[in-house]
Every structure is written in C-alpha cells, then in structure tokens.
Amino acid sequence: MHSTDQNQPLAPSVPATPAPAPSTTHSLRNEIRVWTRDLLIAIGLALVIIVFLYQPVKVEGTSMAPLLSDQERIFINKFVYRFEPIHRRDVVVFWYPLDHSKSFIKRVIGLPGESVEIRQGIVYVNGRAIDEPYVPTQYEDMSDYGPLRVPNDMYFVMGDHRISSNDSRVFGPVASKFIYGRAVFAYWPVDHFGSLSTTEASSTDSK
C-alpha cells in the first residue's frame, strides 16, 4: 500500500494568464477608416453643392475694378434669387439686354419703382445721395444722367469703374428675368481669394 506524505510541500499554483488587451493598432486603423469615410462624404456633399448651386465664371474687362479684375475667376450663386429679392449693392450676373449670347457683371444701384439720377458723379436714388465706398475717386465719372424711373421688375445696374463701364446708363435697366446669379466668392488669382458679399465655366463680360 502506498501512502502520501502529508508534510510534502504542495506545488505552487500558476496564476491565470489575463486576456489580451484589444490591439491599439487595430483600434487606430478603425478610427482612420471612419475618419476617411466621413471626409470623403463631406467632400462629396461639397462638390454636389458647388455643382448644383454655384457656377464658376470668368470676368472679362475692368468695369468692376477694383473689386474684380480682368480674367478673375469667381463663383456665382445660381439659385439665391429664387428665395430672396435682389438687393441694392448686390453684384449680379445677367444676360446683356442687347445681345443675350453675352453675360455682364455689374452692381445693382436702383430697384424697381425708384428714381435714379446722377449729378456730377454723385448717384441719387429717390432724391437722396447714396453712399458708394466701392467706387474709388479715380474711377468716378463726373457726368450727369437722368432722372430715370426704374420700371417694375427691372433694375438699374452700374460698374464700379464708372469711367469704363457699359451699364444701365447706356442700355437702360435690366429685367429681372435676365439676372441669373449673384457673385459670392473669388477663387483666382489666389491673392483675391475670398468672399464677395456686399461691402456666384462661362465667360462674364464686365465691359
């Protein structure tokens, strides 16, 4: 018969091996994947907005200097006037009333029903001189014009470079149906990069 020595020391117990922690590399990879997906979605949505809401145009001429220069590239908002009215000082793009194959870009000066008059280069709307900080002194035209009553659903537009602008002083007010966008952002050249909010490739003539 075999006996067991009660005094024999027991073998030491081995602690259980803890479960491995989640891989840090795997977690980081998932985060990068999610971040990349969200970035691509954001870029895609931005492109959709630009394509459907905005239109790139090229400015030709200097009549909107110094705000816009010849060959400058800008975006116009094509749908803004479906949701809000045209405002004074808006820089708008429209089909040239005398040749609908051409587009012009000018600033809105007179609204429907208003009286527009120019005396020694100062523009009066309904008998009151309007403030025009966007027209530098060297670009002022001291000629007289009007008075003229702007017909309903039409707008009196002028270039900021008054001396070289072919605008409503020449071809008269522009019908709202010919106005198809508002200038909102300049993107080229890079030193002009920024908003064109009041202080939207086709070719836009600003002569």
Where are these predicted regions, by residue range?
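Single-pass alpha-helical transmembrane signal-anchor segments in small membrane proteins across taxa
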Residues: I43-L45
